């Protein structure tokens, strides 16, 4: 039995054909083989923690518009395996919640019916680029954003319209056993080229999605429906302006009793239930109850919407989150306020630059007194010396200079969270050279059916 209709062609999954228990064993052995030769001293690997859900676990998906073959009908979904251009219709993908598949299908059918073209990577023309869908696991709130190019007549090319008409004619032929005449087809092309504005097009799309909810076809409900302009030539989602078509531009998710406000572009773990397992393990590793400092200063670097910062705040005097995406920082501040947390501070900036500025300020004024909260954000991001550090960097890990600055703080213990184990493996070398040793290490399967896995390492500085 196939995992999904695109099992042989899609590059999204890796372990569809084997039992989940076997997948976990493979991932555990990969982590063991990667770190065993690198870790100095005892090898404290604790194995892998399974995901609470094996499918329908993803709370975020980024789908692409395109076609499966040159000049084929409009497709919306994921890239074909080993292909930069070909897009597969993936509304039956089993990684996200089924609500996302229904939204995906409704969106594709709507724009196919309107004869709207996708953005061609080579010709740099066309309208439709990506569809971002996020859904709260605990709240059921759904946030959808259509990412598109500048609206122009080329968005409705004759080829695109002919393709949409051909699809409609096939449907009519199967349903009514009749075919549209050539003259009628030509007339329809002309009508489609002139009858709709961007405002009307987007309004119609929004209404087509809302009808899913009104007709009871979704388990969740829409928090917001948005559209985002992206005129960049890069094949990536670039936010050059987002407008609300319905509702609001954020939704809420709950983790470990806390509320988190999330926008289309906020970093947030894509497996909410798995994230709870991850963060529970981080709190266990931190175990600040028996430290010399009763209420430590904690740094959460690459903090996203401030999830770890807030979860660590209950054992901290002050917890500082540093994140480069300003939108995520604003969400983090709002999240902390809504959760009634008063000892969190969030700084918008690149981790390397913030640490360099802090180092320069400390050199000028001498070491900043422990716990001095005089500020920080208003006074050049000056931060007190941390007692404990958590880093959760992007997939490629930390910049070497940022890691050097973290090491220079000389904290007794730090936690490194890695969504790409090889990045942690690379960064272990300078950390161990500076006297840190891995005291605890585990993997968390945040991405079932894929070959990705999260790792957590607790490092402690040896006494010289």
Go through each PLM region and give its residues:
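Local cysteine-cluster metal-coordination motifs and their immediate loop/turn environment
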Residues: 2-18
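Residue-level signal for inorganic ion chemistry
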Residues: 13, 131, 420
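Extended interfacial segments that mediate partner engagement and assembly in macromolecular machines
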Residues: 14-120, 138
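Short, solvent-exposed loop/turn elements at beta->coil junctions and helix N-caps
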Residues: 46-54, 121-123, 129-134, 231, ...
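Nucleotide donor/acceptor-binding cores
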Residues: 59, 140-142, 296
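Short, low-complexity Ser/Thr-rich regulatory SLiMs
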Residues: 65-69, 135-137, 229, 445, ...
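Upstream accessory/linker segments immediately N-terminal to the RecA-like ATPase cores of bacterial MutS
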Residues: 73-74, 80-104, 108-113, 117-166, ...
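Rossmann-like S-adenosyl-L-methionine
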Residues: 151-184, 188-464
């Amino acid at each position: 039995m196939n995992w999904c209709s695109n099992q042989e062609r899609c590059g999204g999954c890796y372990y569809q054909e084997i039992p989940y228990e076997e997948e976990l064993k493979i991932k555990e052995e990969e982590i063991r083989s990667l770190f065993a030769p690198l870790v100095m001293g005892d090898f404290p690997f604790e194995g892998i923690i399974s995901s609470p859900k094996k499918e329908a676990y993803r709370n975020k998906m980024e789908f692409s518009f395109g076609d499966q073959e040159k000049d084929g009908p409009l497709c919306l979904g994921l890239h074909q395996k080993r292909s930069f251009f070909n897009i597969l219709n993936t509304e039956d993908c089993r990684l996200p919640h089924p609500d996302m598949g229904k939204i995906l299908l409704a969106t594709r059918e709507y724009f196919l019916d309107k004869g709207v073209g996708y953005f061609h990577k080579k010709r740099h023309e066309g309208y439709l680029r990506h569809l971002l869908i996020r859904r709260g696991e605990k709240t059921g709130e759904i946030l959808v954003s259509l990412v598109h190019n500048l609206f122009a007549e080329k968005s409705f090319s004759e080829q695109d319209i002919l393709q949409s008409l051909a699809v409609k004619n096939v449907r009519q032929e199967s349903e009514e056993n009749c075919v549209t005449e050539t003259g009628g087809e030509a007339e329809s092309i002309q009508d489609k080229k002139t009858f709709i504005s961007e405002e009307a097009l987007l309004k119609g799309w929004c209404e087509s999605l809302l009808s899913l909810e009104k007709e009871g076809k979704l388990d969740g409900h829409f928090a917001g429906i948005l559209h985002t302009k992206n005129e960049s030539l890069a094949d990536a989602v670039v936010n050059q302006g987002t407008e609300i078509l319905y509702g609001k531009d954020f939704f809420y998710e709950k983790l470990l009793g806390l509320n988190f406000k999330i926008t289309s572009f906020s970093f947030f773990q894509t497996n909410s239930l798995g994230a709870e397992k991850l963060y529970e393990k981080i709190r266990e590793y931190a175990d600040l109850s028996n430290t010399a400092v009763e209420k430590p200063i904690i740094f959460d670097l690459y903090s996203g919407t401030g999830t770890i910062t807030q979860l660590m705040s209950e054992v901290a005097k002050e917890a500082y989150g540093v994140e480069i995406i300003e939108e995520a920082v604003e969400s983090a501040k709002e999240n902390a306020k809504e959760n009634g947390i008063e000892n969190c501070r969030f700084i918008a900036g690149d981790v390397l630059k913030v640490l360099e500025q802090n180092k320069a300020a400390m050199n000028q004024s001498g070491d900043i007194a422990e716990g001095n909260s005089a500020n920080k954000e208003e006074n050049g991001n000056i931060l007190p010396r941390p007692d404990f550090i958590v880093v959760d960097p992007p997939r490629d890990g930390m910049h070497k200079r940022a890691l050097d600055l973290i090491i220079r703080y000389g904290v007794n213990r730090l936690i490194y969270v890695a969504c790409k184990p090889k990045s942690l493996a690379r960064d272990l070398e300078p950390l161990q050279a500076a006297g840190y040793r891995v005291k605890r290490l585990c993997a968390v399967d945040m991405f079932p059916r894929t070959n990705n896995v999260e790792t957590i390492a607790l490092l402690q500085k040896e006494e010289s």
